[in-house]
């Protein structure tokens, strides 16, 4: 059985070093897709690079935890900025869901304005779209616009409640991260997906060159390790040997 493999690099637009790392992993490695932070400091640079790579699938990386929102969000921001206090608000069930829905629509339009096209798919920074309160908003939005959505099925409370016309990969993995950034780890992810009989799989990654913005991230130098592994010739060969076809979210 032919299986589609989407290797999606998150954080396009975060910094020039991030952008260049993603492009390097696409041109000379196994990355096939990326998602962009429309409020990132280097989003215009990302859009410029993407025009040189029309086959690179570019989706939207919905962000509610970093930087300035596109719209006014007095119920979620502090001093005009987004932050990780969203987790506490989710636990307390005090999320401003109307503001979040409006911000999603605004970020989507911002993506179209910057990139000049619709995004191929939708996911989010720090996976906030998988919060139980936020997921229905994002799932409806993606289904209405006919774009695919990253779904971590281990965290969806009831998969039967998903919109029938919502597209996603059958499998998703965030395991290629942190201490487990090795070719062996990547291949274990593929083998586990194949064992489950999944016809499509998304593997999340964050390849980057380190610059001043990336140095401020808690997840800094591992991004360089990711880039090294993802551009390995042996990894590309091993993926092909397992019968996976590289693709984007337009292929599912």
UniProtKB/Swiss-Prot annotation:
GO molecular function annotations of the record: chitin disaccharide deacetylase activity; deacetylase activity; metal ion binding
Pathway: Glycan degradation; chitin degradation
Compartment(s): Cytoplasm
Superkingdom, taxonomy of origin: Bacteria
Main location: cytoplasm
Family matches, as Pfam families: YdjC (PF04794)
Record carries keyword Metal-binding: yes
Entry's Gene Ontology cellular component terms: cytoplasm
Keyword list, A-Z: Carbohydrate metabolism, Chitin degradation, Cytoplasm, Hydrolase, Magnesium, Metal-binding, Polysaccharide degradation
EC number from the UniProt entry: 3.5.1.105
Gene Ontology BP annotations: chitin catabolic process; diacetylchitobiose catabolic process; polysaccharide catabolic process
Named cofactor requirement(s): Mg(2+)
Binding residues annotated for Mg(2+), in chain numbering: 61, 125
InterPro entries found in the cross-reference section: COD_ChbG_bac, Glyco_hydro/deAcase_b/a-brl, YdjC-like
Catalyzed reactions: N,N'-diacetylchitobiose + H2O = N-acetyl-beta-D-glucosaminyl-(1->4)-D-glucosamine + acetate; diacetylchitobiose-6'-phosphate + H2O = N'-monoacetylchitobiose-6'-phosphate + acetate
Subunit structure: Homodimer.
Similarity annotation: Belongs to the YdjC deacetylase family. ChbG subfamily.
Function, as annotated: Involved in the degradation of chitin. ChbG is essential for growth on the acetylated chitooligosaccharides chitobiose and chitotriose but is dispensable for growth on cellobiose and chitosan dimer, the deacetylated form of chitobiose. Deacetylation of chitobiose-6-P and chitotriose-6-P is necessary for both the activation of the chb promoter by the regulatory protein ChbR and the hydrolysis of phosphorylated beta-glucosides by the phospho-beta-glucosidase ChbF.
HAMAP family attached to this UniProt entry: COD
Protein name: Chitooligosaccharide deacetylase
Species of provenance: Salmonella paratyphi B (strain ATCC BAA-1250 / SPB7)
């Amino acid at each position: 059985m032919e299986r589609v493999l989407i290797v999606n690099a998150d954080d396009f637009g975060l910094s020039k070093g991030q952008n260049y790392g993603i492009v390097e992993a696409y041109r000379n490695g196994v990355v096939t897709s990326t998602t962009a932070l429309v409020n990132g400091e280097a989003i215009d640079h990302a859009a410029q690079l993407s025009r040189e790579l029309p086959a690179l699938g570019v989706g939207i990386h919905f962000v509610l935890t970093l930087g300035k929102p596109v719209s006014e969000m007095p119920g979620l921001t502090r001093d005009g900025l987004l932050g990780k206090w969203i987790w506490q608000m989710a636990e307390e069930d005090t999320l401003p869901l109307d503001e979040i829905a409006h911000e999603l629509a605004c970020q989507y339009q911002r993506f179209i304005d910057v990139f000049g096209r619709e995004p191929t798919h939708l996911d989010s920074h720090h996976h906030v779209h998988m919060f139980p309160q936020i997921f229905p908003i994002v799932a409806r939005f993606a289904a209405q616009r006919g774009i695919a959505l990253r779904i971590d099925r281990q965290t969806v409370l009831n998969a039967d409640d998903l919109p029938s016309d919502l597209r996603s990969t059958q499998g998703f993995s965030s395991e290629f991260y942190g201490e487990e950034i090795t070719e062996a780890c990547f291949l274990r992810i593929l083998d586990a997906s194949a064992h489950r009989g999944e016809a499509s799989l998304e593997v999340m990654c964050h390849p980057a060159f380190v610059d001043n913005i990336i140095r401020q991230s808690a997840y800094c130098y591992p991004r360089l390790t990711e880039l090294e592994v993802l551009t390995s010739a042996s990894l590309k060969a091993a993926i092909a040997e397992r019968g996976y076809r590289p693709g984007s979210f337009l292929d599912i």
